[in-house]
């Protein structure tokens, strides 16, 4: 129960309250029927269990949708969670028309009839057993936000598993069939009688059979006489009502036979076409909405693209400025390095020139000194040679001629001889 939030009460019955609730996980608005079963008799408890079992089986666009059940044993309460019908019920619509003294449009009546028959076709033709509603009345026919009919309140419904007939006296007297009010066997055609009474009330704004006491009402229902519907309605509507409010259940059509009636069959096809065209119209509207959304998205993308282009231009400009700045700084560093290198080279060159000049001076001095020494040495050598030569001549003069010695003397190289 913590997963639901109570929004407010919608109605109150003999065994509990019907409240509008909101499912917290998704915010969906639903209804729960709170039923206290503590003081119920076994028969009533069985009807309650029966309703839940039937609701679990039914999934149809014209039947109130069942979602879940919660059993609170400490408080002896059962919560049946169902679809919320925001349009109220058919009894409220009839009361409104009665107060305003206006008749319903015939197309509204036909649409209601076709939707009720669609719901009954679902429950009367089930393979796992025919389901009788047994309490069809304006208060049990709900309207959604689009004014579509939803058959609800299956508290008196019965599944015919073993027999084609039921015997129990249940239902609302104004809408009960003759066989049902007399305690005779009845089947799904009894629901058709109730639908006939309901459609009649939509046209005339009052039930076909009214009385001040049960006996009088029973007598009128047994006879089956009622006042004609207002003349503003078609003969087809009057004919269909007379088919449904037929005291002889064997002559009264079932749902499938009613849907096969020519005018109703035509209305069914017309309704299907209307639903189809409404679907196309809705698809067209949805497409227009999607196109508008896509157009808005495209426009937003264009704006974003322009912003991105502008941003890209700004970034490119910044990158260019940064690159120019970086190139300028790099070139400046290169220029400084070149200047430093040139200065270093100049310094080295000057140093080399200075060293070279110093070396040259030293060389000159050395050469000058060496030249003087060489000159002196040369003079001394020449003097020595001259002296030696003279000595040799003297020796030759003193000695006898010896060819070998002469040859030896002349083949010996002379130092620094020029």
Curated annotation (Swiss-Prot):
User: Which residue range or ranges hold the Protein kinase domain?
Assistant: 4-264
Q: Does the keyword Aminoacyl-tRNA synthetase apply?
A: no
Q: Which GO terms describe its biological process?
A: centrosome cycle; chromosome segregation; microtubule organizing center organization; mitotic cell cycle
UniProt GO molecular function:
ATP binding; protein serine kinase activity; protein serine/threonine kinase activity
EC numbers on record: 2.7.11.1
Q: Name one GO cellular component term.
A: centrosome
Q: Which Pfam families match?
A: Pkinase
Into which EC class is this enzyme placed?
transferase
Q: Which UniProt keywords apply?
A: ATP-binding, Coiled coil, Kinase, Nucleotide-binding, Serine/threonine-protein kinase, Transferase
The similarity annotation says: Belongs to the protein kinase superfamily. NEK Ser/Thr protein kinase family. NIMA subfamily.
Question: Catalysed reaction per UniProt?
Answer: L-seryl-[protein] + ATP = O-phospho-L-seryl-[protein] + ADP + H(+); L-threonyl-[protein] + ATP = O-phospho-L-threonyl-[protein] + ADP + H(+)
> Which residues are annotated as active site?
135 (proton acceptor)
The gene from which this protein is expressed is nek2
Annotated ATP binding lies at 10-18, 33
Which domain of life, per UniProt? Answer: Eukaryota
What is the protein's known function?
Involved in centrosome biogenesis. Seems to be required for recruitment of centrosomal material and might be involved in de novo centrosome formation.
Residues annotated as transmembrane = none
Q: Which Gene3D superfamilies match?
A: Phosphorylase Kinase, domain 1, Transferase(Phosphotransferase) domain 1
Ranges in a coiled coil: 278-363
- Which InterPro entries did the record assign? Kinase-like_dom_sf (IPR011009), NEK_Ser/Thr_kinase_NIMA (IPR051131), Prot_kinase_dom (IPR000719), Ser/Thr_kinase_AS (IPR008271)
The name of this protein is Probable serine/threonine-protein kinase nek2
């Amino acid at each position: 129960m913590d997963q639901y939030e109570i929004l407010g009460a919608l109605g109150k019955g003999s065994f509990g309250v019907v409240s509008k609730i909101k499912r917290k996980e998704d915010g969906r608005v639903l209804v729960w029927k709170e039923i206290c079963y503590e003081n119920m008799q076994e028969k009533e408890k069985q009807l309650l269990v029966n309703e839940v079992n039937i609701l679990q089986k039914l999934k149809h666009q014209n039947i109130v949708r069942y979602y879940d059940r919660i059993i609170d044993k400490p408080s002896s309460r059962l919560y049946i969670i169902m679809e919320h019908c925001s349009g109220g019920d058919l009894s409220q619509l009839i009361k409104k028309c009665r107060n305003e003294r206006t008749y319903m449009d015939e197309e509204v009546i036909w649409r209601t009839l076709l939707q009720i028959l669609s719901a009954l076709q679902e429950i009367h033709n089930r393979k796992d057993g025919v389901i009788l509603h047994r309490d069809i009345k304006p208060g049990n026919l709900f309207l959604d936000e689009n004014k579509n009919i939803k058959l609800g309140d299956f508290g008196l419904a019965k599944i015919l598993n073993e027999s084609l007939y039921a015997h129990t006296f249940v239902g609302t007297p104004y809408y009960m069939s003759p066989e049902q009010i007399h305690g005779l066997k009845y089947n799904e055609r009894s629901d058709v009688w109730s639908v006939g009474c309901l459609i009649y009330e939509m046209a005339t704004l009052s039930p076909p059979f009214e009385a001040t006491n049960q006996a009088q009402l029973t007598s009128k229902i047994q006879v089956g006489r009622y006042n004609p519907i207002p003349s503003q309605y078609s003969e087809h509507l009057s004919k269909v009502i007379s088919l449904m409010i037929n005291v002889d259940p064997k002559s009264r059509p079932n749902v499938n036979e009613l849907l096969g009636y020519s005018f109703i069959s035509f209305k069914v096809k017309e309704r299907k076409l209307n639903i189809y065209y409404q679907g196309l119209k809705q698809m067209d509207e949805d497409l227009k909405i999607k196109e508008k959304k896509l157009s808005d998205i495209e426009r937003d993308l264009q704006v974003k693209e322009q912003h991105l282009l502008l941003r890209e231009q700004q970034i490119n400009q910044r990158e260019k400025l940064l690159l120019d700045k970086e190139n300028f700084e790099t070139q400046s560093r290169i220029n400084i390095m070149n200047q430093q290198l040139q200065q270093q080279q100049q310094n080295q060159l000057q140093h080399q020139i200075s060293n070279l000049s110093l070396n040259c001076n030293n060389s000159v001095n050395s050469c000058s000194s060496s030249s003087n020494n060489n000159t002196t040495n040369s003079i001394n050598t020449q003097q020595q040679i001259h002296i030696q030569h003279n000595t040799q001549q003297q020796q030759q003069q003193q000695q006898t001629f010896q060819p070998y010695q002469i040859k030896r003397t002349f083949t010996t190289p002379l130092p620094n001889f020029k």
